[in-house]
Each structure stands twice: as structure tokens, then as C-alpha cells.
């Protein structure tokens, strides 16, 4: 890696920077009018995320509007599933629906090996266009869903309130679930390598539903497979920073640190100062402003950013929300978040 790296990549690598980089999870999406207008013309989420021209355009919308330090691929954690033989649809206001939820060993044995350059070439295309056009004015981010969260979707068949189906599999037929998780870990590792090869400079793993596990079960069904993904990626790209985000992770921070990731993205339910004490010093911190705060006034947003930043001092740090930005968030408040974030200095 040459010098003149973009700010977010420099910070993620632990280099000295003048201010913390700032971006937002789900920064491209429903809170932006320009996105809603485009959605009216292209109502299918899968088309918006799998047509390279549309995905590129949407990925660039927040960059053009707010100039965040990170430009993240517009996609979905379920996007790689069809390449493994699992079809899905995303229904507006209902979320993802899996066509044939996984229930038995035959389905798992019939899963295809993911070959990203074949089934996900549109992702490669978008990332290389972003890398070229963003031109190091920001860092290009890729992302994936972690094995446990993907398994939760494909076993439950949709979003769930209590995850009874996947937990039933975990506690009645653990061997079956481990086989599925292992398949996902290898596939997702390959997918991340493909994203990095295509232009992603930093990548984030979302294990959105791992916070539904007890710490004991996290150590069996989530942590080892996160680590497997990280190991696969680091073997080929040891320098590429990896961020891990789990919603509801306050009870898991020490465990997350053992997966080999470079940065832990915190949700807003943990005090960032406390998190810094619990997470080993070499690991960076990202987060963790409550996205609900962006429904407040500008002063409260600025004040919370200052507090969060001051509590993170002395650490490798990236300013972000503690969850994706919420639909209905006023765009001018998102702008305040980015503008004020960029005024912070070390």
C-alpha cells in the first residue's frame, strides 16, 4: 500500500490521523429523497442492489450529498445466497423471504459452492467503479453477513422475533447447523476476498443476530465461524482492515475481540468508555451514536458526537452510528452528523 491513503483506511490501519473518519451504516437508503425517487422507478430491491448501474448510483448518493469518509457498497447481506442455490426476495416493509427454508441435511449437502466471480460479478463491477471514481477521496467499503446471521435467515425463512427455528436446530441437531455454518463461513470468506480484489479497501462483517445468543452459545455457533471468515480473508489479504458489528453486543465484546478482527463496531447500548476498557488496546472502535438521536435537534446531535468522541480518545476510532440510520431521519440531520464529525480534531 502506497502513501496518500484515504483517511478511513489510514485510521483503520492504526496510522496517525488528524481527525476520526466518519461514515454511517445504511448511509445509502430510504431516508434520502433521491433514493426514494429512484425506488419508485425500480421497485424491486434485488434489482436495485444487483443491477451494477443502480447499485453504483445508490452507493454514490450519500457521497455526493455529504462527502462521508467511507463509501459503502449498496447491497444486502443475503445477496450471495442465490449463488449457493438459496433463492430469496425482499418485500418492502416485510423484509427478506427465503424461498425454501433449510430444514434437513439433503438441502445442506445440495448447496452450491459460492464462486463470487460468476454469481456476484455485478458486485465486483460496482466496487471497481467506486474505487476508480471515488479516487481515494474516501475509502471504499465492502461488507458481508456472518454465517450465524445468514443461517438464521435461511432456517427461519424470514426475520424472526425469537429465533425459535434456528435455536431448535442448534440445540436438537447441532451437527446439521455446524455443517451449514461451515459452508457459509467458507463461502463468505471467498466472497470477501472477491470484494477486496475488486476494490474494497476496508470490509465489515455484520452478525446482526448473534446478539440473540447467550455468550456460551456465541462461543459455539457464532464466534468460531466469524473467526473462520477472518482467517480465510487474512491469509490472502493480511493488511485489509476488518470491522465486526453485532447488534446487542454489550455482553460479547471480549469474545468479539478474539475473532481476529481489527475494529469492533459498537451498538449504542454500551458506553464507549466502558467498551474501550473491555476491548484490547490494539483493536479499534467504531460507533456508536444512537440513530434515534438523528430525530432530535442539531445541538443534541453535535453534543452527543463530542461526548462520544471524547470518550474514545486514545483509541483507533471511526465515528459512526450504533446501528443503520433509520428511515424517516431528516436529511439535514444526517448532514449535521457528517459536518460536525469532520470538525473533530485530535
Curated annotation (Swiss-Prot):
UniProt-listed Pfam families: URO-D
Site (Transition state stabilizer): 76
UniProt KW Repeat keyword: no
Protein source organism: Prochlorococcus marinus (strain MIT 9515)
Protein's name according to its UniProt entry: Uroporphyrinogen decarboxylase
Major subcellular site: cytoplasm
Top-level EC class as recorded in UniProt: lyase
Entry similarity comment: Belongs to the uroporphyrinogen decarboxylase family.
Biological pathway: Porphyrin-containing compound metabolism; protoporphyrin-IX biosynthesis; coproporphyrinogen-III from 5-aminolevulinate: step 4/4
Subcellular locations according to the entry: Cytoplasm
